[in-house]
Each structure stands twice: as C-alpha cells, then as structure tokens.
Design a protein with these regions (language model features):
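C-terminal partner/receptor-binding element of secreted or periplasmic proteins
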Residues: 124-160
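Hydrophobic residues embedded in beta-strands of well-ordered beta-sheets
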Residues: 67-70, 101-105
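Bacterial Sec-dependent N-terminal signal peptides
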Residues: 1-37
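Sec/Tat-exported extracytoplasmic proteins
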Residues: 48-52, 92-98, 152-159
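A mature extracytoplasmic/lumenal domain signature
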Residues: 74-76, 87-92, 98-100, 109-113, ...
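Well-ordered beta-strand positions in beta-sheet-rich domains
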Residues: 83-88, 132-134
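N-terminal secretory signal peptides
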Residues: 28-85, 93-94
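Short, surface-exposed polybasic-and-hydrophobic patches located at secondary-structure transitions
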Residues: 102-122
Length: 160
C-alpha cells in the first residue's frame, strides 16, 4: 500500500498556501486602466475645484474627456458663460501655488493652445487663445497634486 510522505495536515497547509499565493498574485493590479485614471482625475478635479472666489458664479462644470481635453465651463448669475478648453498633449507644465487648504492649479501649454470663449457677455463675447489657465482649488495636498500630475502626464503621453 502506498502512503503519502506528506501528512494530512501538511497537505491541507500546502493546498491553502498555494491558494493564498494565487489569490495574492492575481488579487492586485500593477497599474490602473485608462478608464480608472479618467474617473479618478475627473473626481479629483471636481472635488478640488473651488468656486468661492467667484461670488457671482451660478454653476460650473469641469471635465477631462476621453479624447484628452480638459474643459471648464462657468455660468454666472447674469447668464454670462466662460468656457476654457485645451488638449493635454499641448500641456507643458502643471504647477500648484498655495497651501494644503487653498491654492491655484496653473496649467501651461506650448503656445496659445487654451481656447477661451465667453457667451452672453454684456461687454461683448470673446473668442481667443491663452497660454496658461489658473484653476482655484481647495484641499489639494502634496500627494493629491502629485497623483493628479501623474494622471495628466499619463494622458498627455497617451495622446501623442
């Protein structure tokens, strides 16, 4: 009669260890998918945007699109709208000026690559281009800014 050289308890421990190693190996992803980066970036920008400096601001919308455009639309109480948009492959630098509680994200592009438009402005509609865009934010600590910068760089390199 053949008998195993591994006792029954040893077999159970060995099988359990193998399943644990398999679960550990396949349970963690090494990197986020593009959709996860996009969702996280939109959530970070939306949660961090600080509309309080514009007391007449009625509503706002900030979006990072799947085709690598960052878009900001502001609507004021009088009906005036401001619209800013640029493609991330034109982004050269992102800086953060401020503290952990409040500050400004400054986006810089290669040349006049940021679309600036106003609608229903009593002083006349504007359709121009800019090189930088300042975005007032709050609760932007160093780790969050670094993660956002990595995400934006990921999309910038992806769009090249």
């Amino acid at each position: 009669m053949k008998t195993s050289i591994i006792p029954a308890i040893g077999k159970t421990a060995l099988i359990t260890s193998i399943f644990a190693l398999i679960a550990l190996n396949y349970g963690f992803k090494t990197e986020m998918s593009e959709q996860e980066w996009l969702n996280w970036s939109n959530k970070c920008l939306s949660n961090s945007f600080n509309p309080t400096p514009d007391i007449n601001l009625k509503k706002w919308e900030i979006t990072l699109t799947g085709d690598y455009f960052l878009r900001l639309r502001k609507t004021y109480q009088q009906g005036k709208q401001e619209y800013f948009s640029f493609n991330l492959h034109r982004l050269t630098n992102v800086d953060y000026l401020g503290s952990d509680t409040t500050g400004t994200l400054k986006f810089n592009t290669q040349t006049d690559d940021i679309i600036v438009q106003t609608y229903e402005d009593p002083e006349g509609n504007i359709d121009s281009m800019a090189t930088s865009l300042g975005l007032p934010v709050h609760n932007m600590n160093t780790m969050r800014f670094d993660s956002l910068k990595i995400a934006l760089n990921y999309f910038r390199m992806k769009s090249l």
